[in-house]
Amino acid sequence: MKNKFLLFIFVAASFFNINFIAHSEESIEDIIKGRKAIFSNNAKLAKRVNILLREFEVEEAEPIIFEMSKNYENLLNYFPENSKEGYGTEALPIIWEEKDAFNALMQKAADDMLQLAKVMEEVDDIQATYKKLMWANCNACHSRYRKPH
C-alpha cells in the first residue's frame, strides 16, 4: 500500500512538473510574441500619426499617441530574464545587460509621447517636434537593442 501511494505521488508530481515546464515555455512564447506585437503595432501607429500630423489632424492623432505611450509602458513587463532567445525575437542580449538603461528608454518614449500630445498644437514645426519626441526614441532603441535587418 505504501509503495502504491509513493508511486502515485511520483506520477502526480511528474505530471505537474511536465505541465509546469510546458506552461513556462508557452509563457515565454507568449511574452516574446506579445512584445513583438506591441512594437509592430506602435510602428503602424507611428506611421498613422505621421500622416495625421502632416495633415494637421491633431485631434485625430492624440488618442493614437496616448495608445503608443501606454504601449511603451507595457513593454517594461515584456523583457524578463527567461525571454532572451527563441520565437523569432529580434531583441539583442544587451537589453538584459543594460536593463535599467533599456527600461529608462521605454519610459522616456512613453513620456515623450505624452509630451508630444501636450505640445503638438502649440509648436511651429510639428514635424521637427514629432521627430524629436518620437522617432529619436525609435532610432535609439533600434540602433542599440534590436538585431539589424
Spell out what each predicted region is.
Residues 26-149:
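Sequence context surrounding c-type heme c attachment/ligation sites in exported
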Residues 14-21:
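C-terminal segment of classical bacterial N-terminal signal peptides
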Residues 1-8:
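Bacterial N-terminal signal peptides that target proteins for export
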Residues 11:
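Active-site-proximal loop/hinge segments that shape catalytic or ion-binding/gating pockets
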Residues 7, 21-27:
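N-terminal leader/targeting peptides and immediately adjacent processing regions
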